[in-house]
Amino acid sequence: MRYTILSVAYPLTQVGPDAAGGSEQILTQLDAALTKRGHRSLVLAAEGSHVSGELIASPKAGKRLDDAARDWGQRVHKELIRSILGKISVDLIHMHSLDFHRYLPVSNVPMLATLHLPPDWYPAEIFALKNCNLNLNCVSSTQRRACPPSVPSISVIPNGVDVNRFHPTHKKLGYAMALGRICPEKGFHLALKAARLARSEFLLAGEIFPYSSHREYFDRRIAPRLDRKRRFIGPVGFQKKIQLLAEAKCLLVPSTVAETSCLVAMEALASGTPVIAFPSGALPEIIDHGRTGYLVSNVKEMADALSKVGSLSSAECRREALARFSSETMVTRYFDHYAKLIEGGRSAETRVQDPRRLSWLVG
């Protein structure tokens, strides 16, 4: 059966193959798979996004990403969703953003919200909704355990990456690297400290989004620690990321928050590159300590791990990624879940939302 799926991204962030955020990358993979399999994929995302299906572009909010821009983006998203549902027969809405509750439509269309971030970053009330057509999904078992135990129906579909686009190389170079959004919770200043302590070359790749806290973090915590051996190379496209991960001796993931998943760690392993990380959130689900990387507790242990990471097997890292982190497995599980929710929504009139139950959320 051919479905029409509306995927909704965060209003202020573009989606596409080169997107920095995990939620944008997962949305991009699902959009491509829907289109490839003959479904109609509608993507509501910021202007400038690149999708395989049909882009419904939300206008840019301006150069500054602040509370006013966020509020404006949420209002625009809400109106666009209402307009889409008035014109197109949508089978399911898949929300991917932290603030999805601000533009939930009042509709009998089944809705799935994937929680890409720690559960305590979302309003507690989303876990208390009953008898409505909003369904929640987690991206790791660790994240699911952090959700309120009173909500037994949250599904778990682990993230995956396109492992076939990453390839090991025998030409390993001497640098460690880190990659991601340049923001305080990623802890990249700690990776710089560890690299300096280990006297290791280090590359930091990523985008600085125009949030004042992100810019301040880079200026105060990152820039002063850069030198000829430890460099910041800015954002990189997908092809460059493939090369960098393959040639790195290891990936460093010094996250200071409970990661719900870690796509770049999966990509590194698919490249035959081991990962050294703090045991934050779901990272112990991804890294097999002493076999595909090391789980460390502090900067000193990260530096020590840098000195011995060369003894780990690149082939073993690659085998682990192929066995556990394939995007094909993720996509199949999502599509099965879509079908279940769509068929359930068609047969259960009690799942039609009462606007009064969601008024506190949608404003």
Predicted features by range, described:
Residues 1-363:
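Catalytic cores of nucleotide-sugar-dependent glycosyltransferases that transfer UDP/GDP/TDP-activated
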